[in-house]
Amino acid sequence: MKGKNTVFFIMTFGTLLLMASCGTLRNGRGWGQDATIFPGWRRLGDVAVDTMTTPVVWVPLAGALLFQVDHLDQRLSGWASKNTPLFGSNHAAHDASSFFSEPTRYAYIATMLATPSGDTPESWAIAKLKGFAVGTVAISASNTTTNYLKRTAKRVRPDASDDQSFPSLTTSNAAVNATLASHNLDSLDIDEGTRSAMKYVMFSLTAITAWSRVEAKEHYPSDVLVGAAMGYFFGTFFNNAFLGLSKNNDIAIVFGPKQDGFTVRLFWSF
C-alpha cells in the first residue's frame, strides 16, 4: 500500500507542477507573499465565526451529538466493526486508514508548491516558506488540540486497547491536510470542473479515512465526526486568517526579508 501511495503522490505532484507557473495570482500578488503573523483582531474574529458556522464544521458536530442518543454511537460502531462492509476485516480497515489518509498530506504539499508565488526564484521561495509556515501551524494546532482532547476525555476505544478514542487524530489530520489542499486549489489557474473534481477527491479521502477507523474498531462514529470538523476548522481558519489572500479590514503586520536584513510592514485595506 505504501508503494501505491508513493505512485499516487508522484502522479499528483507531477500533474500539479505542470499546472503551476512562476507567475502571480489574479490580484498580482504571490501565494504566501502576504502571509502575516497578526492579521488583526477583527479579522481573526470574523474568520473564526465564519468558519464555525459553515456546514462542514457544525454538521459533523451536530451529528456527533445525535450519535449520543439511544447508544447510536456504540451500536453503529459494533455493527460496522463486526460486518466490515467496506473493507472486509478490522485489519484491512486499519491498513486502509493509513492508505487513504497519507495522500492528503502529499496533496497539500503538491498544491502548495503548485500555487503561483512570484516571478523570480527568490520571491517564489520566500512566499512559499511563508505560506508553508501558515499550513504547518494549522496542522500543528489541529494535532495539538486533538491530542489535548484525547488526554482530557480519556474515552476507551471500541476495542478497549487504550483510552485515546476521542477524537480521532487520523481523521483530523487527514481533514486538515485535505482542507489546506482544497484551499490551495482555489489559487491555481485551472478550469472549474478540474478544481471541483480534485476537491471531491480530497473530501472522499477524508470520509473514507474516517469510516475505516470505525470499521477497524478503533473509533466510534462521533470520534471521527469531531476529528473531521476540527481538521476543517483549523485548516480553513489559518488559511483565511493568516495567508492574506482576501481583503483585510483590520491592521496587519507582515515580515519580509530584504537584501540587508528584514522589513516590517504595517498595512490595512479600506
Question: Could you tell me what each predicted segment is?
Answer:
Residues 60-65, 102-112, 176:
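Hydrophobic alpha-helical transmembrane segments of multi-pass integral membrane proteins
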Residues 73-84:
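Interfacial/capping segments of alpha-helical transmembrane domains
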Residues 22-28, 63-75:
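Alpha-helical transmembrane segments of multi-pass membrane proteins
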Residues 65-69, 106-108, 144-150:
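C-terminal TM-helix exit segments that contain a strictly Trp-centered aromatic cap at the helix terminus
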Residues 113-119:
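Conserved, well-structured interaction surfaces
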Residues 88-110:
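Interfacial helix-start motif at the membrane-water boundary
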